[in-house]
Regions:
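Membrane-embedded transmembrane alpha-helical bundles that form the catalytic cores
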Residues: 2-414
Length: 414
């Protein structure tokens, strides 16, 4: 059996146009079944497993074995906590189970930073499965999830279109969506949306991201390294080129994932909503990698604020929210990887959000003072909004330069 699995080709999800020929052919019966108000549950499982297996194999089975161990580990934790939550609500058991659920991703992220080798527990998609697993544990405690069947749990974790890189869904929304087969008119709308997303995704990922990342970026990096110094003009070009390449690559991927989800009768959450039109950093995080930022907002930021408020760690609520912003974004930086530039990226955005909130509060105070003095408030016309967009865009691009890791090559690798 293992030899047969080893002989399977490696098929990178959404890695090339040929992938869509395979996946659309495979899920066409699913869409036809939905059109006639039928879900072919076992066929869906087989399709998902086939594409996940080929995603993780290609001569080796270590990633597949890691996935199997991971699923058993998470299932044991969720089963235990589901039964425990029916009779008790101890916070320390909740913290312990959440930590144990996070252990695999902690090992995967920390090991390369310690000895430079990849963890045997790692596999494509482990980060996004962890968000789903921990999210379920949190929602079991909150009472959002009243009942959880293991086959529904596995179906949620192993949903093929979003397995490798999201978008990050929530169990309750996904499960309710799965159980409700769309009406024919809605299904046809989802088909039209899928075609549109796939076309835009081809433009974003296979044309624009390819031009920026494969054609323009390498020579710019070489020129910047040859020029040397702490900073040079080529670094500015790298900043914008990488920033747009990152957006087009990931936004294109997200469009593909949503399109294939639609064809399987599931409306996965959108990930990007014109992020470069944001007027401030807070709005940016409501438009950029939305399923990730909303996950951190709901399950990390809001809970830190509640805990710090309940324990009265700070007298001022603005200080509480500021500390939560920084810790939340630092944690997001660590999630990307244990390197100084990912951590600096998180800290950069954490401080940026603190400054953003401080300016909003300051502007409100100044407007009140101006009103008392009989003067008009600061203008909020389209030109001011445009200025906010321009400033936010460039601040974000600076953060993407940090995120790219190129400054590490420029400053420390000789």
């Amino acid at each position: 059996m293992m030899e047969l699995i080893k002989q399977l080709p490696h098929i990178e999800p959404y890695g090339n146009p040929q992938y869509f020929l395979y996946v659309i052919t495979a899920i066409l019966p699913i869409f036809i079944g939905l059109f006639f108000k039928k879900r072919f549950g076992w066929y869906e499982i087989l399709v998902s497993l086939f594409f996940i297996v080929t995603m993780l194999t290609g001569g080796k089975t270590n990633q597949l074995a890691a996935l199997g161990i991971y699923l058993i580990w998470q299932m044991v934790l969720v089963l235990f906590y589901k039964q425990y939550r029916k009779v008790r609500d101890g916070k320390w058991i909740f913290y312990l189970v959440s930590l144990l659920s996070l252990l695999p991703i902690i090992f995967v992220k920390v090991q390369p930073a310690i000895n430079g080798t990849q963890s045997l527990l790692g596999f494509v998609g482990i980060s996004y499965l962890t968000f789903r697993s921990v999210g379920i544990i949190i929602e079991l405690r909150d009472g959002v999830i009243k009942d959880l069947k293991m086959w529904e749990y596995l179906r949620f974790l192993l949903f093929m279109p979003t397995f490798s890189s999201g978008p990050i869904d929530r169990f309750k929304r996904f499960n309710e969506n799965y159980k409700t087969i769309p009406e024919r008119d809605e299904l046809l709308d989802m088909l039209a949306e899928s075609v549109r997303y796939i076309m835009w995704g081809f433009l974003y990922k296979f044309i624009l991201a390819h031009i920026l990342g494969e054609i323009l970026l390498p020579p710019l990096k070489n020129l910047a390294l040859q020029t040397g110094g702490v900073f040079n003009y080529y670094v500015v070009a790298i900043m914008y080129t990488f920033g747009f390449e990152l957006f087009f690559d990931f936004a294109g991927y997200s469009m593909f994932a949503i399109a294939i989800s639609n064809l399987m009768g599931i409306r996965s959450p959108i990930n990007f909503n014109k992020p470069f039109l944001s007027r401030d950093l807070k709005e940016f995080w409501n438009r950029w990698h939305m399923s990730l930022s909303f996950w951190f907002r709901d399950f990390v930021f809001m809970r830190m604020v509640m805990v710090m408020t309940r324990k009265k760690l700070f007298k001022n609520r603005n200080v509480t929210s500021s500390v939560a912003y920084v810790l939340n974004m630092l944690l997001m930086g660590f999630w990307h990887g244990i390197t100084w530039f990912y951590i600096a990226y998180g800290l950069f955005h954490g401080i940026g959000l603190v400054m953003n909130d401080a300016w909003v509060r300051k502007k409100k105070t100044l407007n009140k003072e101006r009103k008392k003095a009989g003067r008009p408030p600061f203008p909020e016309n389209r030109w001011i909004q445009l200025l906010g967009m321009v400033i936010t865009f460039h601040v974000v691009m600076v953060s993407f330069l940090i995120f790219s890791g190129f400054l590490n090559d420029l400053w420390f690798k000789k």
